[in-house]
């Protein structure tokens, strides 16, 4: 472009010896440039002309003098700021109005600083510590009690219950037997290792047994039927000297009449009603 043809791209007025603005390599007189290309200030709604500094944030524009905190009116030029509901706020006003308060120290958690959230509350990272060892918990596993939050090692040391069988921590649930706690999965028959959680069981020397194992190993046997006599279901039995019978098995060895609540005679561990036993060489 020669000086003889140096003119405004919009109004074609000569720019020789005049102030002008280049846009996309094309010259414009100041008046046309301001009218055609100037952005409008978000605050005062006036054009930001070529002789003014245009401050831009998320496709919004301000005069340098209009770029202020909407709450305290302090300038935000070359200062950190935050936006809320399209309002610009200095960090102090934003913190007072919008930031979370630390659950521990009750102070504001400043924008941009790391915060920890747990059960709807917020902490400074340095305030979110184990109640016992006072070490930061961060994102590590934790267990919460009314007295505070605890890292897992401290909780296990201070509060946890241990399984009587495997000696490991019981974190939830569990079964109490003989004043001892057990994991549900550890509460097994001491004989066959059957799961006893949903089963009837009996004990021997503080060890749990399923009914079958207990009867097989420890229950007295009926003299008549040789089957175990178990009191688990409330079954009645008869005991005489060192022998025991199911009540339904306590019958005369000759006529089979029930002898429960009746007098009887014995001969070589057999029992007889008085009628059948009369004339026999009985023990009693």
Curated annotation (Swiss-Prot):
Zinc finger intervals, C4-type: 8-32
Compartment(s) where it occurs, according to its Swiss-Prot or TrEMBL record: Nucleus
Biological process annotations from GO: positive regulation of transcription by RNA polymerase II
SUPFAM superfamilies named in the record: Glucocorticoid receptor-like (DNA-binding domain)
Tissue specificity statement from the Swiss-Prot or TrEMBL entry: Testis-specific (at protein level).
GO CC annotations on file: nucleus; Z disc
SMART domains assigned: LIM
GO terms of molecular function: transcription coactivator activity; zinc ion binding
Subunit structure: Interacts with CREM (via the third LIM domain). Interacts (via second LIM domain) with SPAG8.
Name assigned to this protein: Four and a half LIM domains protein 5
Gene: FHL5
């Amino acid at each position: 472009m020669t000086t003889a043809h140096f003119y405004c791209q919009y109004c074609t007025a000569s720019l020789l010896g005049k102030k002008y603005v280049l846009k996309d390599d094309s010259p414009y007189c100041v008046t046309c440039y301001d009218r055609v290309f100037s952005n409008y200030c978000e605050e005062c709604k006036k054009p930001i002309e070529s002789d003014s500094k245009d401050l831009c944030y998320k496709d919004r524009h301000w005069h340098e003098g209009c770029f202020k905190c909407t709450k305290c009116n302090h300038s935000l030029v070359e200062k950190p700021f935050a936006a809320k509901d399209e309002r610009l706020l200095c960090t102090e006003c934003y913190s007072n109005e919008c930031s979370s308060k630390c659950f521990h120290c009750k102070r504001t958690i400043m924008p941009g600083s790391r915060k920890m959230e747990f059960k709807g509350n917020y902490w400074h990272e340095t305030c979110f510590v184990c109640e016992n060892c006072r070490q930061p918990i961060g994102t590590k596993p934790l267990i919460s009690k009314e007295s505070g939050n605890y890292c897992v090692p401290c909780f296990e040391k201070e509060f946890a219950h241990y399984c009587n069988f495997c000696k490991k921590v019981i974190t939830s649930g569990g079964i109490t037997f003989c004043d001892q706690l057990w994991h549900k999965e550890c509460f097994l028959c001491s004989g066959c290792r059957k799961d006893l959680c949903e089963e009837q069981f009996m004990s021997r020397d503080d060890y749990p047994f399923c009914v079958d194992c207990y009867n097989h190993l420890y229950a007295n046997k009926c003299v008549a039927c040789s089957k175990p006599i178990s009191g688990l279901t409330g079954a009645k039995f008869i005991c005489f000297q060192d022998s025991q019978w199911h009540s339904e098995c306590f019958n005369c060895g000759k006529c089979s009449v029930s002898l429960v609540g009746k007098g009887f005679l014995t001969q070589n561990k057999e029992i007889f009603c008085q009628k059948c036993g009369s004339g026999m060489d009985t023990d009693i």
